Curated annotation (Swiss-Prot):
EC number, UniProt record: 2.1.1.14
Positions contributing to 5-methyltetrahydropteroyltri-L-glutamate binding: 16-19, 116, 519-520, 565, 609
An individual GO BP term: methylation
Residue positions of the active site: 698 (proton donor)
Keywords: Amino-acid biosynthesis, Metal-binding, Methionine biosynthesis, Methyltransferase, Repeat, Transferase, Zinc
Domain of life assignment: Bacteria
Textual note on the cofactor: Binds 1 zinc ion per subunit.
Keyword Metal-binding: yes
Protein name (Swiss-Prot/TrEMBL): 5-methyltetrahydropteroyltriglutamate--homocysteine methyltransferase
Native organism: Marinobacter nauticus (strain ATCC 700491 / DSM 11845 / VT8)
CDD domains cross-referenced by the UniProt entry: CIMS_C_terminal_like, CIMS_N_terminal_like
Cofactor dependency: Zn(2+)
Known catalytic reactions: 5-methyltetrahydropteroyltri-L-glutamate + L-homocysteine = tetrahydropteroyltri-L-glutamate + L-methionine
Length: 756
C-alpha cells in the first residue's frame, strides 16, 4: 500500500499574494497582523490543495527563507539583527534584508549573506556561526503551523532542515570549525523533536541534502553522531535527500537510525534498486518519482513499469513523493488559459504534480485499471510531445553541426585587446558603471501590461520606453558614471525577455517561482530548438547611445544563464540546448557591434549554479558551459570590449575556469561576503579586468563611502589598480530611484577619491 506525501509546497501563492503582502508590509502599507492573516490564509489554501495526500508538509511555509526560519527556530539570529528595538518579525527581516519594516534607513544593519540553494535558483540566508554561537529553542512558528494543520484534520508532517545540513550551509566568521558546534546544537534539535511529538506529530521530515555532496570523514561522522543521538526522540524521523545521487554516502544514509529515507529518483534513478536492497526491512523508502524542479508531465506508464516490482517488494514501506520540495515549480497550470494548447498539454505545475503522484499511488494500490483513463490521457500527452514537429528545427541542427573550435576564440590575447580598447574608450582609472538594469517603476510595469493587453499601441509603448531611457541616461550623466547603460525598461526579466524573441520558447502568465524573499521569477519554457529570427536589443541600445557621448553598454543575457534560468526540455542533453542558445546570442553580439556599440555585456549570473553538486563532475559541465559563452562572445573585433557579470556565487574554486571565459571585464557580487572572492587571487593571478561589487543592491541600505574605499583598497592589494572597475554587485531593477541615486552618488564619490 503506497503512501503519498510531499516535501514542500510553493509558498508565494498562485497570484504572488505573499510577495505583495511582504512588500506592502515593508512599505508601511500593511500591519504585522495583516501580514500574518495573509500568511495563514495561504497556508490553509496550500494544505487544501494537498489534502489528497496521506501526509501534508508543515513548516515549509516561510515569510522569507526556510534556512533563516531554521536559524530563528534554533535561536541563531545575528546579534546585530536581534539587539535593536522592535518585534521579532523586525529582527527576522533585518537578518534577511538589513532593515525591519519599522527601521529608518539611517538605522539599517548589514543584511545576512545570501547564496544559492545547492544548484537551484533559490537563494537562502547563510547561517552565521562562530566558536561562541549559542543555540536556544524557539519553536513557536512550527508549533503554530502544526496546530493550524491539525485543526483542519490533516495528517501533518513537520519539515525542518537537519542538524548536519544546517551547519554545512553555515559559515564561520572566526575560522572555527562548524562541526565543533554539533554537540551544542543536538540538544536543541532533541527538544524541538520532543515538542513536535507532544503537539501530535507522528513523523518529522529532516532535510539533509548535504548527503548528495562530497563529504569527508568528519562530516560523515557528524551524521552518525547526530542521528544516533536523535533516535531516542518520539516522532518517527524521515531523512530526506534530494538534488542528486548519494554515491559514496549511500550506505551511510541507509544505515542511519531513522524510520525512513527519501531519495530523489529523478536525479538518481540508478540508486533506487541499491537503496531498496540496502535499506533495513523496518524502514520506509520514500521515492521522489515526480520531478519537483521542472514542469514537464511525468511519463506515468514508464514510471509504473519500474515502480510496480518495488511495490511488490516493499509493500507498506513504499512512500511516493515529488523528487524535492515543489518550491521550485509554479503553483497551478489550470490558470494558464492563454498558453499554446499543445505545449500546455505537455506540462505539470505543483498542483498537477500532486495529481500525478496520486494517480501513481492508485495504480499501485488498486491496479492500473483503476486509473485507466488518466494513464491513457497521460500517454497521449507524452506521445504528442515526443512526436511534435515543433520540437526540432533542421536549420538549427545544421548550424550546430557546423560549429568549429575557432568560433570560441578572439583574434588576439587580452593584453593586445585591452590596449586597443583603452585607446578607443579613454576611460579614467577605476571606471564606474552599473550592472545593467535601473528601477522598474510602476509606470514602466503599467505600460508593459497595457501593451501586452493591446491597450497601448506599439508606437506609444516605444515612445514611453524611450522616455524612460532618456531619464536613465540623463541620471547617469548627472551622477558622473563613466560607462552607461540604457536601464532595460523594456525588459520584464533578463531571461524571459530574450526567450520571448527566440523560436523554441513558450511563456506562461502565472508560472512564478520564488528566487528569494519577495523576489519571484517566471522562467520561460525551452521546449524546442532555438533560433533567433531577428535582432532583439539593437534598436534600444542604438537609441540610448544617440543620447550621449559616453559609451553605452549593450546588455545581453548569456547562454548558460538563459539555460539555467529556464525550464529546459529534458529530451536532449542540456549542453546541446546551451550551444543553440550560444549561436543565437553570438548573432546578437555581432549585430550590436555593427550598430557601433563598443562595449557589450553578456551576463552569466547563473554560471556557477549549473555546477554539478559533485566536484568530480565539474570539469564536464565547465567545458561545455564556458565553450558556449566563448562562442557567444568571441565573434567581435579586438577593440570591442566584452563584459560579463556573475552573481550570488562563490567562485574561488572555479576561478581558473572563469579566467578561461576570457571576458575583457568581469563584474561580480562580493559585497555581502566582504570581498571573500578576492582570497582566490592570493594563489591565482586573474589576467583580465575585474569589477568587484562594492555595495549590496539586494538591501535598501545606502553604502558608506569609506567602506567602498576600503573594499577597493583591499581589492587593489590583489589586482593591479589599472584593472579594477567600480560597480554595484548586481542590477538595480528591484530598487527605488530614491535608493539608487544616493547609493550611486556615494559610489562615484568613492571612485573620484580613489583616483586622487
Amino acid at each position: 500500500m503506497a503512501t503519498t506525501h510531499n516535501l514542500g509546497f510553493p509558498r508565494i501563492g498562485g497570484q504572488r499574494e505573499l510577495k505583495f503582502a511582504l512588500e506592502d508590509y515593508w512599505g508601511g502599507r500593511q500591519t504585522e497582523q495583516e501580514l500574518a492573516i495573509t500568511a495563514a490564509d495561504l497556508r490553509l489554501r496550500h494544505w487544501q490543495q494537498q489534502a489528497g495526500l496521506d501526509y501534508v508538509p508543515v513548516g515549509d511555509f516561510s515569510l522569507y527563507d526556510q534556512v533563516l526560519d531554521m536559524s530563528v527556530t534554533l535561536g541563531n539570529l545575528p546579534i546585530r539583527a536581534a539587539s535593536k528595538e522592535g518585534s521579532e518579525l523586525d529582527a527576522y527581516f533585518r537578518a534577511a534584508r538589513g532593515r525591519g519594516a519599522n527601521d529608518s534607513p539611517c538605522c539599517a544593519t548589514a543584511a545576512g549573506e545570501m547564496t544559492k540553494w545547492f544548484d537551484t535558483n533559490y537563494h537562502y540566508i547563510v547561517p552565521e556561526l562562530t566558536a561562541d554561537t549559542h543555540f536556544e529553542l524557539n519553536p513557536e512558528r512550527l508549533l503554530t503551523q502544526l496546530s493550524e494543520a491539525r485543526k483542519q484534520g490533516l495528517n501533518a508532517k513537520p519539515v525542518i532542515i537537519g542538524p548536519v545540513t544546517y551547519l554545512w550551509l553555515g559559515k564561520t566568521s572566526d575560522a572555527s570549525n562548524r562541526l565543533d558546534l554539533l554537540e551544542r546544537l543536538l540538544p536543541v534539535y532533541s527538544q524541538l523533536l520532543e515538542a513536535l511529538a507532544d503537539a501530535g506529530a507522528e513523523w518529522v521530515q529532516l532535510d539533509e541534502p548535504a548527503l548528495v555532496t562530497d563529504l569527508d570523514a568528519n562530516w560523515r561522522y557528524a551524521f552518525n553522531l547526530a542521528y544516533h543521538q536523535l533516535k531516542a526522540n518520539r516522532p518517527k524521523l524521515l531523512l530526506a535527500t534530494y538534488f542528486g545521487e548519494l554515491r559514496d554516502n549511500l550506505q551511510l544514509a541507509c544505515e542511519l537510525p531513522v524510520a525512513g529515507l527519501h531519495i530523489d529518483a529523478i536525479s538518481a534513478p540508478a540508486e533506487v534498486s541499491r537503496v531498496a536492497d540496502w535499506l533495513p526491512s523496518h524502514k520506509v523508502l520514500s521515492l521522489g518519482v515526480v520531478n519537483g524542479r521542472n514542469i514537464w508531465k511525468s511519463d506515468l506508464n514508464s514510471t509504473l513499469g519500474w515502480l510496480e516490482p518495488l511495490n511488490e517488494k516493499l509493500g507498506q514501506r513504499l512512500w511516493l513523493a515529488p523528487s524535492c520540495s515543489l518550491l521550485h515549480a509554479p503553483v497551478d497550470l489550470s490558470r494558464e488559459q492563454e498558453l499554446d494548447s499543445d505545449i500546455r498539454n505537455w506540462l505539470a505545475f505543483a498542483v498537477q504534480k500532486l495529481d500525478e503522484l496520486q494517480i501513481l499511488a492508485r495504480a499501485l494500490n488498486e491496479g492500473r485499471s483503476s486509473v485507466r483513463a488518466e494513464l491513457a490521457d497521460n500517454q497521449l500527452a507524452i506521445d504528442s510531445r515526443r512526436n511534435s514537429h515543433r520540437v526540432t528545427n533542421p536549420e538549427v541542427r545544421k548550424a550546430v553541426a557546423s560549429v568549429t573550435p575557432e568560433l570560441g576564440n578572439r583574434h588576439s590575447p587580452y593584453p593586445q585587446r585591452i590596449a586597443r580598447q583603452r585607446e578607443r574608450l579613454n576611460l579614467p582609472a577605476f571606471p564606474t558603471t552599473t550592472i545593467g538594469s535601473f528601477p522598474q517603476t510602476r509606470e514602466i510595469r503599467q505600460a508593459r501590461l497595457q501593451f501586452r493587453k493591446g491597450e497601448l499601441s506599439e508606437q506609444a509603448y516605444i515612445e514611453q520606453m524611450r522616455a524612460e531611457i532618456v531619464r536613465c541616461v540623463e541620471a547617469q550623466e548627472k551622477l558622473g558614471l563613466d560607462v552607461l547603460v540604457h536601464g532595460e525598461p523594456e525588459r520584464n526579466d533578463m531571461v524571459e525577455y530574450f526567450g520571448e524573441q527566440l523560436d523554441g520558447y513558450a511563456f506562461t502568465r502565472f508560472g512564478w517561482v520564488q528566487s528569494y524573499g519577495s523576489r519571484c521569477v517566471k522562467p520561460p519554457i525551452l521546449f524546442g530548438d532555438i533560433r533567433r529570427p531577428q535582432a532583439m536589443t539593437v534598436e534600444w541600445i542604438r537609441y540610448a547611445q544617440s543620447l550621449t557621448d559616453k559609451p553605452v553598454k549593450g546588455m545581453l543575457t548569456g547562454p548558460v544563464t538563459i539555460l539555467n534560468w529556464s525550464f529546459v526540455r529534458d529530451d536532449q542533453p542540456r549542453k546541446d540546448s546551451c550551444l543553440q542558445l550560444a549561436l543565437a546570442i553570438r548573432e546578437e553580439v555581432q549585430d550590436l557591434e555593427k550598430a557601433g556599440v563598443n562595449i557589450i555585456q553578456i551576463d552569466e549570473a547563473a554560471l556557477r549554479e549549473g555546477l554539478p553538486l559533485r566536484q568530480s563532475d565539474w570539469a564536464t559541465y565547465l567545458e561545455w558551459a564556458i565553450n558556449s559563452f566563448r562562442i557567444a562572445a568571441n565573434g567581435v573585433d579586438d577593440s570591442t570590449q566584452i563584459h560579463t557579470h556573475m552573481c550570488y556565487s562563490e567562485f574561488n574554486d572555479i576561478i581558473e575556469a572563469i579566467a578561461r571565459m576570457d571576458a575583457d571585464v568581469i563584474t561580480i557580487e562580493t559585497s555581502r561576503s566582504d570581498m571573500e572572492l578576492l582570497d582566490a587571487f592570493r594563489s591565482f593571478e586573474y589576467p583580465n579586468d575585474i569589477g568587484p561589487g562594492v555595495y549590496d543592491i539586494h538591501s535598501p541600505n545606502i553604502p558608506d563611502k569609506e567602506h567602498i574605499i576600503n573594499l577597493m583598497t583591499l581589492a587593489a592589494e590583489r589586482i593591479p589598480a589599472e584593472r579594477l572597475w567600480i560597480n554595484p554587485d548586481c542590477g538595480l531593477k528591484t530598487r527605488k530611484w530614491e535608493e539608487v541615486t544616493p547609493a550611486l552618488e556615494t559610489m562615484v564619490a568613492a571612485a573620484r577619491e580613489l583616483r586622487s
